[in-house]
UniProtKB/Swiss-Prot annotation:
GO terms for cellular component: extracellular region. The lineage of its organism: Eukaryota, Fungi, Dikarya, Ascomycota, Pezizomycotina. It comes from the Eukaryota. Belongs to the peptidase S8 family. Its EC number is 3.4.21.-. CDD domains: Peptidases_S8_PCSK9_ProteinaseK_like. This is Subtilisin-like protease 7. It comes from Arthroderma benhamiae (strain ATCC MYA-4681 / CBS 112371). GO terms for biological process: proteolysis.
Amino acid sequence: MGFITKAIPLALAAASVINGAEIMETRAGVQTLADKYIVVMNDGMTDKDFDSHRSWVNRTHRRRLIRRGAKAMGGMKHTYRFPTGLKGYSGHFDEQMINEISKRADVKYIERDARVQINAIEQQDNVPSWGLARVGSKEPGGTTYYYDGTAGEGSTAYVIDTGTDIQHEEFEGRATWGANFVDDMDMDCNGHGTHVSGTIGGKTFGVAKKSNVVAVKVLDCNGSGSNSGVIMGMEWATKDAQQKGADKAVANMSLGGAFSQASNDAAAAIAKGGVFLAVAAGNDNVDAADSSPASEPSICTVAASTEQDSKADFSNFGQVVDVYAPGDSITSAKPGGGSQVLSGTSMATPHVAGLGAYLIGLGKGGGPGLCDTIKQTAIDVIQNPGASTTSKLINNGSGIGFLSFPLNIYEEQWSKLFDL
């Protein structure tokens, strides 16, 4: 499947408390990173107090290394300062140091850092995608995508993923490189991120064909990274969006894993910062309530549907799911040119992020409230959606009377796009 799985610690279910700071324990089988942690500070901490805490950590860590005379731990690596107030850091600390940190009254909780990786990918070359046609039609089985000519113009989509091939012809110069928190190669050497980006803003495969795409790389060529690196990407996207206009921005996270309070808090900080965030529900065919950041209520959680308007057999479900979107055998861009077919809630999610960008182009305004707008325009068609799960499938509103402003409808037929 195309969903990116984060092997993240299970928080809250089992946590030790040392002087008020929880050290989150991990679920059996989770691939944690040895001696690496994420530390989240108390709500409302000032920048001055945060800097003072960080200075204390660095001083204490250095003293411990000198006394130990052992192989050096790396110490503090990433620092998080979300514009909405969430603060924290990650680093490489021994058990004694992390216990010292946990005793601090200004620490809210600590999680073990964990590996992030992608699942197996289904691939088939050079076939047309049905997903776009479904987004623009009230009925299944169509071959034409109906959309307003604004096509997301003026919006920006932050794709937090494996990177994007920004030179791909699908993006017509509208894709740019944003930041890299995993390696020194500003390229998508995996393919997942380019596929996701193409579904959002590609000229052929995109829901919002005139939107801008910003690549935020948090996973390497093998589709692997760390939870701490993903949170850095989330922070960077939030800050950049606020500088350029959060009400014109959307973010896509086609990744997730076991429940993580740090991951959920970072996702909530994006939404609080005024950015619409679409997140994959997951590919384990289980209730997404135990997944992160899918279980964060302030974001838009997306399950995957099939061409027959049924729940994809791999898709997670549950009350936390906001909408369904096409996610089975979706065609989009691949690095180096051309296209490929992938399946997963990873593929469903950019349809929703793209629809958010599309609605921004129509003047509906941005922010987390876009999820409610998307649910209002959705159609009640999904068969067997799963226990306590919505049956709403996204729709762009073209020709079905949901949107309260005039549309200049364009149409694209797959026979034209693919010379069939």
